[in-house]
Amino acid sequence: MDNLEEPLAVGRTAEIYPFGDGKVLKLFFPTIPQAWIDKEVETGRYIQDAGLPVPKVYETVRRDGRAGVVYERIEGPSLLNQLGTKPWNVVRYARLLAGLHAQVHDVSAPPGLETQHEWATGGIPESAKLPEDLRDRILRLLASMPEGEQLCHGDFHPGNIIVTQRGPVIIDWMTAY
């Protein structure tokens, strides 16, 4: 594919382009660290193998000096869009969202992903916005919590659920832990 069409979507980290039959190219902005992209690819392959309803990861590519990932193209509206156009189905959609969330948490996080404790405590020690006593209290509370091994999406909301003919599909795993 030499020339890319107009993007299907533009997010905070990337643009999504049609990329041949049944595929899309998630082309990351140059400011996105390669380590984040590698993590998304590794996590995507892991959760795909775990049987979660996610887009298939095909390959990584470089286009015009930018890193990209070729994914299965997922067709359909987001669950957020469905909520906006069919609000009378809110209870059904809430149950769907809860069921998907439970499915995600039934999977152990892949090796090498940041743990939930590491993620939760990440920026607290350096936060200038928190008073020191509150910062210390939060860190003590987090340290007292049991370690967890469950996969966490990190950005799980109705906008990251695509409703397809084959069922709901969970997208955007960059912030998983």
Predicted regions and their residues:
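Conserved kinase catalytic-core helix
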Residues: 80-114
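Short beta-strand micro-motifs within the conserved protein kinase catalytic domain, predominantly
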Residues: 56-67
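An alpha-helical support segment within catalytic cores of ATP-dependent transferases
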Residues: 106-154, 164-165
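ATP-binding glycine-rich loop module of kinase domains
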Residues: 10-37
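The N-lobe alphaC helix and its flanking beta3-alphaC-beta4 segment of protein kinase-like domains
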Residues: 35-50
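Conserved short submotifs of the Hanks-type protein kinase catalytic core
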Residues: 65-78
